[in-house]
């Protein structure tokens, strides 16, 4: 019989681990210490308690209302540009924790309006797990969220909510949904929102959450948008233009706004029926439009652009692309090509035993293996006229998944030669990172 292990649903402190930090932090940096400080308050000394009260809980007349300024740092976006991320002050992170505690159900409600979103919170992440081969799927630090399909199986929840759809955009291009859309519709068009998070007007969360009938039945809903606005601004020096880039809570903030933009767009296309005459799918701020012909996709693009402008957001016309079947974008072509390279690479020195278990094959020249893979990626990028940055996230994700499966193996009872094989396999993968 499967072993059931309870994960406390009432443990809102886990928000501090999953929702308030950027994913792109050094691997040695986490909020585990912050979480432990909160959990150890009952046994802490008076001095420790006073520090936590002042620096985390924000207790005191001067700290309760004062906004905080995030620590800003940059990560590489591509060969020329950088992306600026925000590390929120602990007091602001605690305010986010309290907001989740009060409004978790309303967050789910406002993230359920759009049929177009392919990355949206669906439910509170699993309250229990069964001992099985999938329990460690989220053990290691990644940029993923908990998918609804694995909810109830995963031991290490990477997000407070379980999500419907895809945790990575590239998975959409290889999904059944994408292939079904290609069967049904002749034309595809892409829409990119210009400088999305930097351009979001924080007060627009109130515009997106004003539902009179729902608010009448749920009195606290009337203050949801206002409070979310205050919480986000508190961690960003009280700025109303732009939201902190990096934390998952910012993606949820934007998701609620975009759900309303999706809904307005569908309502304004009165002469067309969604999921019959056209469909669009949205991953955060990337929109993919599908329709019978190009004239309809352009009509939908124009309508969606108008909906964006009502929230002070704008489509980036320079990045718009249109194509007819077969739908092979530069991005999807890269992913398909990289997927082939990755599979050939791993099959040359790893054997899949099923149930998530990988066994290393004999490796005679780690450098030769690594170089062959690197050369194949070079050729792919050269043929597609792109930099490594375009497929870096896909490659890192693929390699990370294999490393996780290898290190989950119990090698304590294995012979020394077999153990050496595991180390060699991991060395090969680190060589190409």
Predicted feature residues:
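Conserved two-metal-ion catalytic palm core of "right-hand" nucleic acid polymerases
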Residues: 1-245
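Generic structural signal of hydrophobic/aromatic residues within well-ordered alpha-helices
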Residues: 34, 38, 47-55, 96, ...
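Short, surface-exposed helix-loop/turn micro-motifs enriched in polar/charged residues
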Residues: 84, 275-279, 314
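Amphipathic alpha-helical segments that form well-ordered structural scaffolds
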Residues: 95-102, 204, 256-264, 303, ...
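Short aromatic/hydrophobic-glycine micro-motifs
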Residues: 105, 270-274, 313
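Short, surface-exposed, charged/polar-biased interaction segments
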Residues: 117-124, 212-218, 222, 270, ...
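Conserved polymerase palm-domain catalytic core
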Residues: 180-284, 289-298, 349-433
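Polymerase palm active-site segment centered on the conserved acidic dipeptide of motif C
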Residues: 294-372
């Amino acid at each position: 019989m499967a072993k059931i292990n309870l994960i406390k649903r009432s443990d809102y402190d886990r928000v501090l681990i999953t929702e308030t930090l950027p994913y792109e932090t050094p691997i040695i940096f986490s909020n585990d210490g912050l979480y432990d400080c909160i959990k150890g308050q009952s046994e802490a000394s008076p001095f420790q308690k006073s520090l936590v009260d002042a620096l985390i809980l924000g207790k005191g007349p001067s700290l309760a209302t004062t906004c905080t300024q995030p620590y800003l740092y940059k990560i590489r976006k591509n060969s020329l540009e950088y992306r600026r991320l925000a590390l929120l002050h602990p007091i602001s992170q605690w305010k986010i924790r309290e907001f989740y505690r009060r409004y978790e159900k309303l967050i789910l409600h406002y993230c359920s309006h759009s049929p177009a979103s392919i990355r949206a919170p669906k439910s509170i992440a699993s309250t229990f797990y069964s001992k099985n081969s999938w329990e460690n799927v989220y053990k290691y630090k990644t940029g993923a969220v908990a998918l609804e399909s694995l909810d109830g199986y995963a031991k290490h929840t990477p997000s407070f909510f379980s999500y419907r759809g895809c945790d990575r955009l590239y998975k959409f291009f290889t999904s059944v949904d994408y292939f079904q859309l290609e069967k049904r519709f002749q034309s595809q068009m892409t829409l990119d929102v210009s400088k999305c998070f930097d351009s979001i007007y924080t007060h627009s969360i109130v515009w997106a959450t004003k539902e009179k009938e729902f608010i009448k039945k749920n009195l606290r809903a009337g203050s949801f948008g206002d409070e979310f606005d205050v919480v986000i601004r508190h961690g960003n020096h009280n700025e109303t233009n732009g939201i902190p880039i990096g934390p998952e809570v910012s993606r949820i903030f934007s998701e609620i706004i975009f759900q309303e933009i999706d809904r307005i767009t569908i309502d304004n296309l009165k002469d067309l029926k969604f999921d019959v005459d056209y469909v669009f799918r949205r991953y955060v701020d990337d929109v993919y439009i599908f329709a019978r012909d190009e004239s309809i996709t352009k009509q939908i693009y124009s309508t969606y652009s108008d909906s964006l402008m009502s929230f002070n957001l704008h489509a980036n016309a320079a990045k718009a692309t249109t194509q007819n079947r077969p739908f092979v974008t530069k991005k999807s072509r890269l992913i398909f090509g990289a997927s082939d390279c990755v599979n050939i690479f791993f099959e040359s020195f790893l054997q899949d035993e099923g149930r998530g278990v990988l066994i290393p094959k004999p490796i005679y020249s780690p450098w030769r293996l690594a170089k062959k893979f690197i050369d194949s990626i070079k050729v792919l990028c050269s043929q597609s006229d792109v930099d490594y940055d375009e497929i870096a996230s896909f490659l890192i994700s693929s390699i990370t998944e294999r490393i996780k499966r290898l290190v989950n193996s119990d090698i304590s009872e294995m012979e020394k030669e077999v153990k050496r094989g595991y180390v060699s396999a991991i060395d090969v993968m680190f060589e190409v990172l």
